[in-house]
Regions:
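Sequence-level preference for short, compositionally simple segments enriched
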Residues: 2-354
Length: 354
């Protein structure tokens, strides 16, 4: 395997070789220092998945110093690690919202708002925050902090902060989001990516963890925040949000699995659902999670989708929001044997993010 190259990003600017004042400058420098071989770049462009790790591509570790980096970034090179100084110290933030008008006169749309879009396999991030501070969804529209579209993407001790649609765990659904859509993944192959989020903090409103990826959330804290100054009366409903909105592809065996996570909120009691299906075949399972009182007794909403297609399940939920006897009749309370089928090893097919 190629020798790892270290790059450094400091707010005060370059103080040593391979040191930069912005993360974007560090990303651009990678291709000058060690270009991705042309044949591999061509295969990645087609959406092919390589065995882990991608031995032929020089790995980079970007050491990002404390501070706020107001940048909007796309990473399309594999074998890259972002290493911050602490998720409360190193913050990558931008503020694009879906309702804003682009130069072409059209709204930006959901999938062009991401503060960071990861369009490559084998990405790792530790000890930093990804944020979209555009504002609440009812004013600015959807606003992604993170768009993850690649296999073997690993996040440890990171925070994802936003409002509506904080984390897009890609790929997109099979059907186009809109005719002639301009989203960056609209015309790409829908390849199943495995993503692991370990000891992370995720915050948002509406349904802020969504997409078609295969994702395992291990010991994460998930905070459903009250959606600004919009009260239930404004929407003629007592529902404040949904934690997940999976759009799992029919041929993917797993969607989202949340294991030993803690769900918290400043929303009223019983006002947030565990999930609703963005598309027909959504799959989401909660295992041994602590549920706050904000979780709706029904747990799940069908969003008008066909019962028997999507799959929602829980195993050993606890806390004031755990209420197996009142859960929606289309959801499942798993046995121990059934829950074992959702182990990290099975869901991620032997890849653990290390």
């Amino acid at each position: 395997m190629e020798k790892t190259i270290d790059l450094y990003v400091k707010k005060e600017g370059a103080a040593r070789e391979n040191c930069f004042s912005t993360i974007g400058e560090a990303i651009e420098a990678m291709e000058r220092i060690a270009p991705v071989p042309e044949e591999i770049a061509a295969e990645l462009e087609k959406g092919r998945i390589y065995p882990s790790p991608v031995y032929e591509v020089t790995p980079f570790v970007v050491h990002i110093g404390a501070g706020e980096y107001r940048e909007k970034l796309v990473l399309s090179r594999p074998n890259v690690t972002f290493l911050g100084e602490g998720r409360d110290k190193t913050v990558l933030v931008f503020g694009d919202g879906a309702n804003e008008i682009e130069e072409d006169g059209e709204k930006r749309g959901t999938f062009r708002t991401a503060t960071l879009r990861i369009d490559t396999p084998d990405f790792t991030a530790r000890h930093l925050t990804f944020q979209n501070d555009a504002g609440y969804g009812h004013t600015v529209g959807q606003a992604l902090a993170l768009y993850v579209d690649g296999d073997r993407c690993y996040f440890e001790d990171c925070a994802m902060l936003g409002s509506q649609d904080t984390l897009f765990d890609a790929p997109l659904p099979l059907d186009p989001v809109k005719p002639n859509g301009k989203g960056p993944g609209e015309h790409k192959p829908r390849i199943r990516g495995r993503h692991l989020y370990r000891n992370c903090f995720l915050q948002g409103d509406v349904d802020f963890i969504f997409g078609s990826g295969t994702a395992y959330f291990e010991e994460c804290t998930i905070f459903s925040k009250k959606p600004g100054d919009r009260s239930p009366e404004d929407r003629d409903t007592s529902v404040y949000g949904y934690v997940t909105a999976a759009s799992t592809h029919p041929e993917f065996p797993y969607g989202y699995v949340l294991h030993k996570c803690k769900l918290t909120s400043d929303c009223p009691k019983g006002s947030v659902y565990l999930g609703r299906p963005w598309k027909e075949w959504a799959k989401t399972v909660f295992l041994e999670c602590e549920l706050g009182e904000h979780i709706h007794p029904q747990g799940w909403l069908d969003w008008g989708k066909t019962h028997g297609h999507f799959y929602y399940g829980e195993y050993n939920s606890y806390g004031p929001g755990a209420s197996p006897e009142t859960r929606a009749d289309f959801s499942h309370q798993l046995t121990r044997e059934e829950a074992e089928q959702y182990s990290m090893e099975k869901v991620l097919e032997g890849w653990f993010g290390e």
